[in-house]
Amino acid sequence: MSHVHQAGEAFASSPAESRQEIRNYTMNFGPQHPAAHGVLRLILEMDGETIMRADPHVGLLHRGTEKLAESKPFNQSIGYMDRLDYVSMMCNEHAYVRSIETLMGIEAPERAQYIRTLFDEITRILNHLMWLGSNALDLGAMAVMLYAFREREELMDCYEAVSGARMHAAYYRPGGVYRDLPDHMPKYKESRWHKGKALKNLNAAREGSLLDFLENFTNEFPGRVDEYETLLTDNRIWKQRTVGIGVVTPELAHQWGMTGVMLRGSGIAWDLRKKRPYAKYDAVDFDIPLGKEGDCYDRYLVRIAEMRESNRIIKQCVAWLKANPGPVMVKNFKVAPPKREDMKDDMEALIHHFKLFSEGYCVPAGETYAAVEAPKGEFGCYLVSDGANKPFRVHLRAPGFAHLSSIDSIVRGHMLADVVAMIGTYDLVFGEVDR
C-alpha cells in the first residue's frame, strides 16, 4: 500500500501534469439542427454544459434582395418583399408600398386602408401561431403545434381568397390593394378524409363572403387561444424551460435596437401602431400587451395577448368593411392598372396594362423611410429614388437581425438546452435576417 501511495505522490508532483488545465471546447449548433429554424449556425464556446460565448454565423440564406430591387421597376419588387419574412408576408409588402406612396404623394382609399389593417392583423396571428407551434415543438410539446396549425389553415384560406396564393400574396399595391374582398370563400372538396356530414360541417362557415367567414372566426378564436393557454401557460415543464431564461433587461433591449415583442416583453410600451399610427390603426381600439421580467415566458405571454388584441382589431375592421363599400385603388392611372373588363374591349387599356407591368412608372426623386409594426418588430424600408422607374437604393430594416445580434450577450451563463428556448422566443426567420 505504501508503494502505491508513493507512486501517487510522484504522479501528482510531475511538472508536466501540474500545468494541465481544463479548456473550453467549441460546438456547432446548426445549421442542420431542427431548432435552428432553417439556416442559423451558432458556434458555442462551452464549459461543460454551460455556454461561455455564442458566435452567430448568418448569410446562408442571403439572396441579394436589396440589390435585385435596384434592377426592377418599383411595382415588380413587391413579390420580393413576400419572400423576406416568409411568415409575415403582407406586413413586408406594407412597408415597401408605403415608401413608394410617400415619394409619389398618393394615399390609398379609406376602404383599402381598412383592408390593409385587417390583413396586417391576420398576418400577425398567422405569424404568432407559427411561432407558438414551432417553439412548443422545439421544447417537446407536440400537441400545441397541431392545435395552432388548425387555425392557421383557416387564415391561410383568407390569403388564398383575396390573392390566389396561400403565402406569397403580392396583394398590396401602391395606391391600394389588388382587388376588393371576395364574396365567396374556398371550400373543402370531398375526399377520402372529408365526406358527408363532416364535409358539410367544415364548409358551414364558408357559405358566405370572406367577411362573414372572418366574423365567424373572430367569435371562435378566443376559445381556441384559451386551449393553447390550457396546454402551456400553467404547464410545469413549460415554465421550467422558459421562466427566468433569456432575460432581456430594458436597458439591453434599447442598446441592441430591439423592437416588437422583444421590447414589449421587457416592459417597454413601444408599438408603431400606437406611437406612429399608419393605415387605420388610429381608428381602431386595442391595447399594447407588456411583460415584466423580459424572459422567455413573458415573451410567450405577450404573443398570446397580442393574438387576442389582433382578434379585436379584425372584428372592428370587419364591421366597418361590411358597412362601407367603396374603391380599393386610388384614381391615379399612373399607378392604377385598368380593369380586366376594360381590357377585353379597349385596346388602349390593354396597352396601358402592358406598359404598367413591363416598364412600371417613374417615382419622383427623393428619399423616405416607411416602417410598420410587423409581427417580429419594426420592419422598415428606406427607399431612394433618382426619378427613374427603378429604385436607386432600397434598404430593408429587418427586426430579426438586431435581435440575433444580441444572442451572445443573452445566452452567456445558460445551459445548452436553454439555447433552443431562447432562439424560439426570438422568433427568427432568416429570409429577413439574411435578405
UniProtKB/Swiss-Prot annotation:
| Cystines in this chain | none
Uppermost EC category: translocase
**Which Gene3D superfamilies does the UniProt record give?**
Cytochrome-c3 Hydrogenase, chain B (1.10.645.10)
Q: Which PROSITE patterns match?
A: COMPLEX1_49K
Q: What is the annotated localization of this protein? A: Cell inner membrane
What is the topology of this protein in the membrane according to its UniProt annotation?
A: Peripheral membrane protein
Q: Which GO terms describe its molecular function?
A: NAD binding; NADH:ubiquinone reductase (non-electrogenic) activity; quinone binding
Which reaction equation describes what this protein catalyses?
a quinone + NADH + 5 H(+)(in) = a quinol + NAD(+) + 4 H(+)(out)
Q: What keywords are assigned to this protein?
A: Cell inner membrane, Cell membrane, Membrane, NAD, Quinone, Translocase, Transport, Ubiquinone
Q: What is its main location?
A: membrane
User: What SUPFAM superfamilies does the record tag this protein with?
Assistant: HydB/Nqo4-like
Lineage, top-rank taxon, reads Bacteria
Q: Which Pfam families match?
A: Complex1_49kDa (PF00346)
Known EC number:
7.1.1.-
Gene Ontology cellular-component terms for this entry are: plasma membrane
Q: Which family does it belong to?
A: Belongs to the complex I 49 kDa subunit family.
Q: What does this protein do?
A: NDH-1 shuttles electrons from NADH, via FMN and iron-sulfur (Fe-S) centers, to quinones in the respiratory chain. The immediate electron acceptor for the enzyme in this species is believed to be ubiquinone. Couples the redox reaction to proton translocation (for every two electrons transferred, four hydrogen ions are translocated across the cytoplasmic membrane), and thus conserves the redox energy in a proton gradient.
**Could you describe the subunit structure of this protein?**
NDH-1 is composed of 14 different subunits. Subunits NuoB, C, D, E, F, and G constitute the peripheral sector of the complex.
State the protein's name: NADH-quinone oxidoreductase subunit D 2
